[in-house]
Structure formats: structure tokens, C-alpha cells
């Protein structure tokens, strides 16, 4: 009897140890993301990384510096760039996949107060920024066709377009009626012209026409990053973005690492203005900066529809990080 008792005790002990070992084996190990190198352009995408400002592996560069980072020793693990540029880079053979979309449109059309009937008509002077090959013009013609081509004028960049809205005049002094502009430049320009006002939310116009959400900045992950690490990074990014949307003071605190002129130099924007805009809602009920998070593969149809505006082909699932 004593031998049976000892045998049962040992058996229970072994079972307990085995159970403990099994439990220890199934506890997921936290993935270290601290060594991942991240590069974003200055501007709106920085808002998504408000909690990474003090991360020594996170860099912010001017938009025109991104193209040199797709290859070579300086190419980061995570690269944020506008969707179309990234898809074209992949088509040209760079070692990345598209992983997520983090901005969903911050374009608006504002009136300067110069249009007597306050209704956009053929012949009204309308300012776009960039040139005929850039997103504002491509998007404009997708939404409005050629009806207003007679009055279209182009400023070199968003800052000059903002100046046109603030003054009511094109850079050569010509009076203008409407200005196509992005946030947060719109916010600042409206403050400078008491007659100016919002005329159309381009995100809403796009949604009504296409039935889909607009897409702008995308996250690309280098192929050398394994699936577990990449997905852990995306999960953390989604959580931090959603937290800031729920509580904009988190973004405000994160961006507060730099202040004044140094902040503008670091981020490419005045953080006080951006947080103000971020707290506002657009016509679709989303934050006015268009910040959000969706895994790219989950909205492939939206991506393909957006790319079609540029005459680009439907994407293959092979270029998506999963």
C-alpha cells in the first residue's frame, strides 16, 4: 500500500511538472522592437509616431530624401512614404512590402471669399499645388473632370497655395476664388483670411464618388524583417495611433519633446497647430488630419481603386506584408 502511495505521489508530481513546463512553453515571448530602424518624411506621418520621437532609431527626413533610402546600407527596416511612390518602387525591384496605411486624406477645398455667387463654376480661378503629374491634380480631375480646367492655376507647393488662400491672390497677384489645400496648412490660412471658408471636404467627395476611403501615407516593411517582428510592430503602431485618436493629448505630449522653431525643424510642422487640427473632425466624422490605421492587405480593393486614378495596375498580393 505504501509503495502504491509513493508511486501515485511521484506520478502526480511528474504530471504537475509536465503541466508547468507546457504552460511555460506556451507563454508568448515579447518581441524586441527597439532595434528596428524607422524613417518617415517630415509632415503628417510624424503624427503617427508621436511616441517614438525619442527613439534613436527613428529618423525624420524631407520628402525628397526618401527615394534614396529604398536601397543601400541606409535603407531602414520601416519606411513611410506616399502609397503611389512606394508601389512604384516595389515595381522597380526594391526589397520592401506594403504593410499598412496610416493617413486617409487631409485634403480640402476652400473659398477665398472672392467669388460673388459663392458657387464654383467653370471659369472661376482655382489654385492647386504641385504640378500636373502630382496627386492634387490627378485627384482633382478624377473628382471634377475637365469642367474647371480653364481657371486652374498651380502653385509650387502647399505653403504657396496656403498664401493664396490667406491673401485671396495667386502668386502673380491675380485674384483667385478657390484653393485646393491640405491640412494643417489650411487651418493656418483660414485664420489669416476672415472671408475664407471651407467649401468642400475632399475625403467626402472622394467617398461619394468611389465608395471607398482615400489613401495617402503607407508603411513599407523591408523583406529582411521576419513576419513575427513586423506584425508585432504593426500591432503596436495600431494601438498607439488608436490611443491618440481617442485621446489627442497623448500626441500632444509626445510631440512636446521639441518646441518652437526646433519642433518645426524636427517635424516639418508646428505641433500646436497640428494637434489643434487633429482634434477637429472632417465630414466623415474622422480626425481632420486623416490619421488612422489599416493593414494594407485588408483594404487591397481600396488601394487598387486609388492607384487606378494614376493609371496604375491592380496590385499583386505578393507585394503585401502578411
Where are the regions that the model predicts?
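Bacterial signal peptide processing site
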Residues: 18-21
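A structural signal for short loop-to-beta-strand junctions that line the ligand-binding cleft
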Residues: 37, 94-102, 125-128, 204-211
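Pocket-flanking alpha-helical
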Residues: 47-48, 63-96, 107-114, 162-171, ...
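Ligand-binding "clamshell"
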Residues: 88-99, 188-207, 265, 271-274
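Secondary-structure end/capping motifs
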Residues: 225-309
Amino acid at each position: 500500500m505504501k509503495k502504491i502511495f509513493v508511486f501515485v505521489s511521484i506520478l502526480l508530481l511528474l504530471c504537475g511538472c509536465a503541466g508547468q513546463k507546457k504552460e511555460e512553453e506556451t507563454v508568448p515571448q515579447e518581441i524586441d522592437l527597439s532595434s528596428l530602424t524607422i524613417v518617415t518624411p517630415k509632415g503628417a506621418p510624424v503624427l503617427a509616431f508621436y511616441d517614438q520621437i525619442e527613439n534613436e532609431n527613428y529618423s525624420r527626413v524631407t520628402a525628397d530624401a526618401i527615394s534614396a533610402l529604398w536601397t543601400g546600407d541606409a535603407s531602414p527596416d520601416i519606411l513611410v512614404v506616399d502609397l503611389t511612390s512606394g508601389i512604384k518602387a516595389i515595381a522597380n525591384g526594391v526589397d520592401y512590402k506594403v504593410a499598412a496605411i496610416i493617413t486617409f486624406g487631409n485634403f480640402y477645398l476652400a473659398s477665398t471669399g472672392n467669388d460673388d455667387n459663392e458657387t464654383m463654376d467653370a471659369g472661376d480661378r482655382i489654385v492647386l499645388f504641385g504640378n500636373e503629374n502630382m496627386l492634387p491634380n490627378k485627384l482633382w480631375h478624377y473628382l471634377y473632370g475637365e469642367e474647371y480646367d480653364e481657371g486652374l492655376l498651380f502653385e509650387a507647393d502647399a505653403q504657396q497655395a496656403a498664401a493664396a488662400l490667406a491673401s485671396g491672390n495667386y502668386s502673380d497677384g491675380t485674384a483667385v476664388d478657390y484653393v485646393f489645400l491640405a491640412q494643417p496648412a489650411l487651418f493656418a490660412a483660414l485664420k489669416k483670411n476672415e472671408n475664407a471658408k471651407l467649401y468642400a471636404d475632399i475625403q467626402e467627395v472622394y467617398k461619394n464618388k468611389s465608395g471607398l476611403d482615400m489613401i495617402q501615407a503607407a508603411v513599407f516593411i523591408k523583406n529582411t524583417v521576419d513576419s513575427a517582428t513586423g506584425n508585432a510592430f504593426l500591432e503596436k503602431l495600431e494601438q498607439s495611433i488608436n490611443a491618440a485618436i481617442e485621446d489627442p493629448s497623448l500626441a500632444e505630449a509626445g510631440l512636446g519633446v521639441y518646441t518652437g522653431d526646433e519642433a518645426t525643424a524636427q517635424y516639418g510642422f508646428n505641433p500646436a497647430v497640428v494637434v489643434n487640427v487633429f482634434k477637429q473632425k472632417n465630414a466623415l466624422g474622422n480626425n481632420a488630419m486623416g490619421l488612422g490605421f489599416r493593414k494594407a492587405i485588408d483594404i487591397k480593393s481600396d488601394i487598387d481603386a486609388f492607384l487606378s486614378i494614376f493609371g496604375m495596375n491592380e496590385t499583386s498580393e505578393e507585394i503585401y506584408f502578411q
